[in-house]
Amino acid sequence: EKETVSAISELIEYYKGIFTILSSCASRQLEEVTFRRGIISVPELFALAEKYFRKANKGKGVAVSFSTRAIDERVVGDFIQLRFLLENLIDEALSVPLDGEIHLAAAVDGEYIRFLFTDMRRTKTREELNQLFYPNLERMMATGEKGELRGTEYLVCKQIIRDHDEFAGKRGCRINAEPAEN
């Protein structure tokens, strides 16, 4: 029993180390872009997400529709990083070859604008959704185009939110993973 506890503790430390390394990689990936705080139009951000989806989905061989519901509001943040966040969510969703619908919507939530990215093709529990933001060896062993590492999209998104917390001066920016309400 003592050996088992020791082995489990060692395994936990090992995975914490991996998580730290991957978070550092995500952070370094974002360091290449200087954080530029500005006022961003939500409809403009959504238009770019639609354009990116069309480009990323071209030739995939699955019937996936992408609908958006923007609101005429503005957010404070880094335009390039927010665009990159949406592109990462789209890339991850399109890595699953299923027909169906993906929705992107925005809504006012107190002082914040809530962005809702919903993949209607998949059903996951809250726990399964939250696990997407942690390292998963199986997801990461799959390589994408040009040999790029896959399965880190959500880690990058998490790091973008952390950067916005730090640099935009608005604490409380979060990614909440929750099942869609039908």
PLM region spans:
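Short flexible loop/turn segments at helix-to-beta-strand junctions
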Residues: 30-40, 76
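A conserved beta-strand-to-alpha-helix junction within the catalytic ATP-binding
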Residues: 36-51
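Conserved glycine-/histidine-rich ATP-lid loop and adjacent helix of the Bergerat-fold HATPase_c
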Residues: 156-172
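Short conserved segment of the HATPase_c
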Residues: 124-141
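Short alpha-helical segment of the dimerization/phosphotransfer core of two-component systems
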Residues: 8-18
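Short beta-strand/loop element within the Bergerat-fold HATPase_c
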Residues: 101-111
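Conserved polar catalytic motif of the HATPase_c/GHKL fold
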Residues: 87-92
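Conserved catalytic submotifs in the C-terminal HATPase_c
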Residues: 38, 63-73
